[in-house]
Every structure is written in C-alpha cells, then in structure tokens.
UniProtKB/Swiss-Prot annotation:
It is found in: Cytoplasm. It comes from Chloroherpeton thalassium (strain ATCC 35110 / GB-78). InterPro entries: AB_hydrolase_1 (IPR000073), AB_hydrolase_fold (IPR029058), HAT_MetX-like (IPR008220). It comes from the Bacteria. It catalyses: L-homoserine + acetyl-CoA = O-acetyl-L-homoserine + CoA. The gene is metXA. Its main location: cytoplasm. Residues 52-337 form the AB hydrolase-1 domain. Its EC number is 2.3.1.31. Transfers an acetyl group from acetyl-CoA to L-homoserine, forming acetyl-L-homoserine. This is Homoserine O-acetyltransferase. Homodimer. GO terms for cellular component: cytoplasm.
C-alpha cells in the first residue's frame, strides 16, 4: 500500500505568516544554519512605541496557532486581548509547522535536513524569536508566557534579555530539566529509533517511522496525565472484547501525532528540552535565579508528575520578584491545556496587581485556582 507523504502545512493555519532571515544563524553548540524561516501568527496591532507586545511560547508538538489551542484565553477582557495588545506566537526553531527544522529543505543540499539538522537549545529558540520580534518592530515585551517547553522559553527570555521583558508567566515548567524528565524523553526517543523505518533518521517522507513515533507519543501521554485521571476516565472499561478503553485511547493519540508531526523534529526538540539549564555557562544555579527580578508568575499543577510542584516552588523561593500560582486538578501536566478558563483567571489576577514598570510586586502571596469537575474558585 502506498504511504501518503506528510504535508505538515496542512496542520497549521492558513493565516500563518512567515519571516525569512537570509543571514547565517550560529547556534549555541556551534552548528550553523545558512538561513532560516520563522512561522508565526499575530493578533491585534503594535502601538507606536512598540511596547504592547505579548509573546506566547508553545509546548513540544504545538504550533503558532495559539488562538486554537489556548482559545479560552483570547478575547476582550481576557489574558490575550487584541483590542489592547499585539499578540505574537511563533513556531519554535526545530519544529515542523513552518519554522526551519529537520523536515525543512537544506538550501545547501536541496534535500531535507533530517538527522543532520544541527543541535540547538532553548536559547537558540529564544534568539530566533528575538529576531522575529525585531523584524516586527517590537521594542519591548509586555509579557512572555508559556507552558512546559514554552515555560522554559519564558524563563530564558528573562535570563537572556531582561531589559526587553516587562513581565513573564511560566506554567508547569522548571529552570533545568531533571534526570526524571531526561530519562522519560530518552525512552520515547528509543521507541522511535526501534522502528524499522527509522534508518538513523534518514527515512523517506513516504515511509516515516510511524510505529516508533506513535509509541513515543503513547509513553508521553501517560506522563501528561495521572493515574487518577485514567482511573476516572477509563477504569477497566472495555472498548472491545479484549481491548481496554485506555489502550484504544493511547493508540488513537499515537496515530494522531504521526499524521501531523515529524519524528526527527520530535527527537531534536526533546533533546533541546533535556539541555535546558538556566545556569549553563552562567555560574551557580541559585544565583542565576536570584538575578531574575522581572515580575513573574510561576504556575504549578498539583498533580503534575513531569514538573512537580516543588520545582516551581524553588523558582519562586529564589526569584526575588516572583509570585506562585497553583492549579488544582487531577489531569496532571496537561492541565494547562485542559482547564484553560482557570488558567486565564490566574494570569489575569496576576496582571491586575502588577506594579509600575521596574517595581517589585507588593503582594507575593499565592494565587490559587481549584478545579473539581465544573467547580471553579479563584
């Protein structure tokens, strides 16, 4: 049977815009891209002073279409209000939704980069985002916000360009990737490598390592949720005579990802996450955290097994101008993509108490949102 060729452009909005940069990009670990492209979406208008911009940073397999995957946070009077702000979300370096990555054509060879795409880091992602914002005329970020991988980017923005960022929100993330997360990422990569079509990453577009990438996604989905959420949703219910509903759910999630994502991009992006460490080449980790004095909201999820609450508490303890936010839910890491109304209320509560530019938060007491079924209190 003939395999269909992956068309990643079918999985991001027709409203996506592109910025092309013809100058070489030297990456943190020494690799170079001769040129690069950034896919992005924007909402609202940039003001004359260029300082009403908000940057949204997406997670691992996300796209620039934040108005789709974070839709409840958009609208007048909400976190992302395009009547007041200029909101930007760009696809990260190394992804496959329009920004240069392993699935892109190498202009020097005329072929896909594939596994030869150079190693990159969260800092490289942020540098590419800065290039985009410069091209758009942004002079200062009113806020940078992201969850998971997006939160890593938000923190790096504070460390790399502190004078460019007014406030930041980090959700379900950490200042450095733990051995636990690195191990789980490697298990997923090994699942991809075990696919007979992997071929060291030199697979053809017609025959990608679908089984391996699907298995990787199934592993990941188990870490994005919790035992309690699986028990509540599936328990031991059957889909068919010998198939549990939870098995069917995981198979479906795996199949969905292989239709929309590139395996090499998945490998490279998870490796970039594993390299995440705010203190790399900057000195003592805690001193680095102490140096980040931008007004910050650090949001934890009580049931997150990937980035547990103590990691966010540590950030708040050492960052001198940070406030702690908590989402209570049984959904685990994915809560920030599920309980979005609650997240919107948390961020808005933080925004309402922000001090004048350059000042410290007057109130660092935690902001808490409790979610049980349809009940919500802030």
């Amino acid at each position: 049977m003939t395999q269909s060729i992956m068309r990643y452009k079918d999985f991001f909005s027709e409203k996506t815009q592109f910025a092309n940069f013809k100058t070489p990009l030297t990456l943190e670990f020494g690799g170079t891209l001769p040129e690069y492209r950034v896919a992005y979406r924007s909402w609202g208008k940039l003001n004359k002073s260029g300082d009403n911009a908000i940057l949204i940073c997406h997670a691992l397999t996300g796209s620039a279409d934040a108005d789709i995957w974070w839709a409840p946070l958009f609208g007048e009077g909400k976190t992302f209000d395009e009547t007041k702000d200029f909101i930007v979300c760009s696809n990260v370096l190394g992804s496959c939704y329009g920004t240069t990555g392993p699935a892109s054509i190498n202009p020097e060879t005329g072929k896909r980069f594939g596994p030869d795409f150079p190693s990159f880091t969260i800092r490289d992602m942020v540098r590419v985002q800065r290039s985009l914002l410069n091209a758009l005329g942004v002079k200062k970020l009113k806020m940078v916000i992201g969850g998971s991988l997006g939160g890593m980017q938000a923190l790096e923005w504070c460390a790399m360009y502190p004078d460019f960022v007014e406030t930041q929100v980090t959700i379900a993330s950490s200042g450095k990737h733990s051995a636990w997360c690195i191990g789980l990422s490697e298990a997923q990569r090994q699942a991809i490598c075990a696919d007979e079509n992997w071929n060291g990453g030199h697979y053809t577009p017609e025959n990608p390592p679908k089984n391996g990438l699907s298995a990787a996604r199934m592993i990941a989905m188990c870490t994005y949720r919790t035992r309690a959420s699986f028990e509540t949703r599936f328990a031991r219910s059957l889909r068919a005579k010998e198939t549990f509903n939870v098995e069917s759910y995981l198979l479906y999630q795996g199949e969905k990802l292989v239709e929309r994502f590139d395996a090499n991009a998945y490998v490279k992006l998870t490796q970039a996450m594993d390299k995440h460490d705010l203190s790399r080449n900057r000195g003592d980790y805690y001193n680095v955290l102490k140096s980040i004095d931008i007004p910050s909201l650090i949001v934890a999820i009580n049931s997150d097994i990937l980035y547990p609450q103590e990691e966010q508490e540590e950030l708040v303890r050492f960052m001198p101008n940070a406030q702690f936010g908590m989402l209570y839910s049984q959904h685990g890491h994915d809560t920030f993509l599920i309980e979005m109304e609650a997240l919107n209320k948390l961020v808005m509560a933080f925004q309402k108490q922000l001090p004048p530019e350059g000042k410290f938060l007057n109130d660092r007491s935690p902001i808490v949102s409790t979610i049980f079924g349809s009940k919500l209190g802030v």
